[in-house]
Amino acid sequence: MSKFSKKFISASPFKQQDPTGQNQRNILSDIEYKSDEFLGFPEEKARQRTDEYLGIKPDKDGLMEDQNSFEHGDTARHYMGGDQLSRSIREKLGSLGKTSLGRIIGVIGSNVGGLVHEAQNIKEGRPILESVEDATNNFVGSLGSLFSTNTSTRILDRLKKYLPDGKVKD
């Protein structure tokens, strides 16, 4: 377990064990968490990039507005998630990550990770169309990772009005 994980878990006011028979861990959540940890928590990095992109700053109490409350917030979050996961995979590949093959591996890995995440959401009862929209934004973000971070952000600026919003009514 990483230092980040230990610090987070030890600081939690909630008991870290599930009540017997409830919220059983499953293979998808295990894969998602272990991958996130192995890759240096790209989901958290994507969240921070999205906060910066949307101009979200903590209030006087340290609380922050929900990204989904902003126009294009969900779109940006999934785009940045796909972008950041691809970059994190490429970083793990070392010098191979800077090659065309490494970039392709990053894009493919990012999309596999996004699909595992969305499969988990469907299993938890989220609407299928919402996951399809989110996976679309993850895919476009993974392609954005083929460019510099600044260029990728400019691509999001241009495409966000055309991408799905990821907000589906139940």
In which residue ranges do the predicted regions lie?
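Gly/Thr/Ser/Pro-rich low-complexity intrinsically disordered regions
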Residues: 1-22
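Bulky hydrophobic segments
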Residues: 17-131, 135-170
